[in-house]
Amino acid sequence: MKALSLLVRAATCAALSLIAFSAVAADYPTPQEGDWVAGDFRFHTGEVMPDLRLHYTTVGAPSGQPVLILHGTAQSGTAMLSPVFAAELFGQGQPLDASKYYIILPDIIGHGKSAKPSDGLRAKFPHYNYDDMVAAQYRLVSEGLGLRHLRLVLGFSMGGMQTWVWGVKYPDFMDALVPMASLPAEMSSRNWMMRRLITDGIRNDPEWNNGNYMVQPRAAQVNSVFYGIATNGGTLAYQKLAPTREAADKLLNDRLAAPFTADANDFLYQWDASGDYNPAPGLDRIQATVLAINSADDEKNPPETGIMERELKRVKGGRLFLIPGSEDTSGHGTVFFAKFWKQQVQELLQTTPRRAM
């Protein structure tokens, strides 16, 4: 199984170009895209944007039970329409059957078609953090879509961390939380150090010019490949994929030669945003039923640290589903494949009471 850095790129491109085809093939309604503008949006820095554009995709009718699904870093909402995710969840009789659920896939601030530095402000764009991103999602859901309650918030990687933030900041707004490939604790250890290497590498690139570059700094692509290999893919899966030096060289060379279309400012902002993430102090405020899903071979969130078990003790009724590592898993990217956990989510929704909306 290829590492997530390649999978997500391919999945995102496929979702963008073949949304309608995938929907028909997977037997769920054709996704619909929309935009909403949050007026006078205040960032944690105190800066205010008079008009913050938020793009989103929905699957299903607004009359269905609303479900918010949050993508990972450098993705967009349409990444979650990848067949390995959506085709396992949104079809008839599946855990998030779109004939019963109203599925909301936002492009989080700085990503996709939502407002981001490359739209024109470049390095003058406000430096957002995860709290800002979640606050924008809340405004989109409550003001833009007119919803008063969510049945479920589910997120992957960055989206998983922001799922924890949702539970802390808006504890009575949802019935259930499914944070995936994440920990409810501050950035630390390898996870943060690797993120620093991405952002510092871009800032130290000779072409950077404080974000006012004339050509895209090469460091963004090189550091992206480095980070992807170091923090995604799974040990056993990589050994199977590249069992010799020749195979490993080819894999690396292919990734370095692959098209890289990300803007360096966008990329830096996306990774920088996690710096002050830390939901731990507020975990006891969570009211929703929590099912955390991680994989045993997650390079960013290794289970042997015991962090998840320690913090879950403070979440009433919170529990962890840990996917065993194997040649068929892909480290941090394992949970992007819904086949590994869809049954657990179905059982969660069957047993979690619905609150009044």
Which role does the model predict for each range below?
Residues 148-188:
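Conserved hydrolase catalytic core segment
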Residues 173-257:
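Alpha/beta-hydrolase-fold enzymes
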Residues 299-306:
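Conserved alpha/beta-hydrolase "acid-adjacent" motif
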